Amino acid sequence: MKNDPHSASTALPTESLVPGAAPTLEVNITAALASVDVMHHGRKVTIMRNQNQSNMVTPDFAQTSRKCPPFCIQPSELAPGVKTIAELDVLHFLKKISDGDASIMVIDSRTQTWVDKGIIPGTVNIPWDTLNIGESEPAAMQAILENQLGARRQDDFWHFDNVKTLVMFCNGPWCGQSSTTINALLKIGYPAHKILWYRGGMQDWESLGLTTLKPLSK
């Protein structure tokens, strides 16, 4: 596997997410990290944990049992070369993006109904059904691949030499929206080492009381 500077295995220590910051809250992210500032649609948003120690997970993510299929438990390893990551890694990548690294994108693969319930600050919504080979509208899919992900089409072949590193997620371990997108990208040749999967998704993010936002009105 190629050595990718954005690989989660090379993620900086969490202390480096907020240089010089010392935890001053009662509910911190780690023992050495209170919060992380990221940019979301041009404004600074502070990601931290809910300080109400009686707070419970939102009802949208309290349900334990959903019909399977489609809501089936996802594997811990999605595909060879695709690294599974967790919350501290996601925060690391969101911070890098906010600091100006345009080679990374954290993608929320959920459809609008789910997105309306809440989003992770600093992420970009590209619904799974817009990147589903054979089902998505071809011109729209090509536009996403070229304009947002950095792929290029030449002589009826896709070229991925300068594509972005993608961190992808959806609702969590019981949701297949991000895994469907990842498998679709791999099928057309997107490099596996350029894809990271936040398997825990919104379920785990909400369970840890991390900051969410409501999406901007379109």
Predicted segments, located by residue:
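Positively charged, proline/Ser/Thr-rich regional signature most characteristic
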Residues: 73-164, 215
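Solvent-exposed loop/turn segments at secondary-structure junctions
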Residues: 111-114, 130-132, 172-176, 201-205
